[in-house]
């Protein structure tokens, strides 16, 4: 009986929904990104590229930004899952990237950050 209960517990935990995304909390997480990136109306490239319309875009394609060859040639299209992998450890996902950032390790913060970034169209307007 204990094995059955334990098995059901493990099964329930493995199918638990992903962390809910909270754009307002994501805006707070994004504050650590503001040193290098901008987003929203009037956003401009800084040390890092503008992040408007990130999801669905190919890596290394924002006009006017000097990407590393690693980013330009990565073949990545930004999806939520690819971004999760990248933001946890940028240099592991794209070896040779110029992004100097240790990564966001907290899964809830990553989910919230995604929710915040997803709000913005390529022109910086909110969806």
From Swiss-Prot:
Keywords: Electron transport, Heme, Iron, Metal-binding, Photosynthesis, Pyrrolidone carboxylic acid, Signal, Transport. This is Cytochrome c2. Belongs to the cytochrome c family. Residues 1-20 form the signal peptide. Binds 1 heme c group covalently per subunit. Pfam families: Cytochrom_C. GO terms for biological process: photosynthesis. The keyword Translocase does not apply. It comes from the Bacteria. Heme c binds at residues 33, 36-37, 99. It comes from Blastochloris viridis (Rhodopseudomonas viridis). The lineage of its organism: Bacteria, Pseudomonadati, Pseudomonadota, Alphaproteobacteria, Hyphomicrobiales. GO terms for molecular function: electron transfer activity; heme binding; metal ion binding. The modification Pyrrolidone carboxylic acid is found at residue 21. Cytochrome c2 is found mainly in purple, non-sulfur, photosynthetic bacteria where it functions as the electron donor to the oxidized bacteriochlorophyll in the photophosphorylation pathway. However, it may also have a role in the respiratory chain and is found in some non-photosynthetic bacteria. PANTHER family: CYTOCHROME C (PTHR11961). PROSITE patterns: CYTC.
